[in-house]
Amino acid sequence: SPTCIRSGQPCPYNENCCSQSCTFKTNENGNTVKRCD
């Protein structure tokens, strides 16, 4: 079975995250990426 993605790691969907929450964050380069909360 798939393991959940930890906080701070890139994610496609909320369901992939251990926290069940994947939101857009701005990284150090100013790019917007979805990461687990």
UniProtKB/Swiss-Prot annotation:
Q: List the disulfide bonds.
A: 4-18, 11-22, 17-36
Give Gene Ontology CC terms.
extracellular region
Which SUPFAM superfamilies does this entry report, sorted A to Z?
A: omega toxin-like
- Which keywords does this chain's UniProt record carry? Calcium channel impairing toxin, Disulfide bond, Ion channel impairing toxin, Knottin, Neurotoxin, Secreted, Toxin, Voltage-gated calcium channel impairing toxin
Q: Residues at site: Critical for insecticidal activity?
A: 10, 27, 35
Gene Ontology biological process terms from the UniProt entry = defense response
Q: In which tissues is it expressed?
A: Expressed by the venom gland.
| UniProt GO MF annotations | calcium channel inhibitor activity; toxin activity
Major localisation: secreted
Disulfide bond as UniProt keyword:
yes
Keyword Disulfide bond part of the UniProt annotation: yes
Q: Which family does it belong to?
A: Belongs to the neurotoxin 08 (Shiva) family. 01 (omega toxin) subfamily.
- Fill in the domain comment: The presence of a 'disulfide through disulfide knot' structurally defines this protein as a knottin.
Protein name (database record): Omega-hexatoxin-Hf1a
Q: What is the source species?
A: Hadronyche formidabilis (Northern tree funnel-web spider)
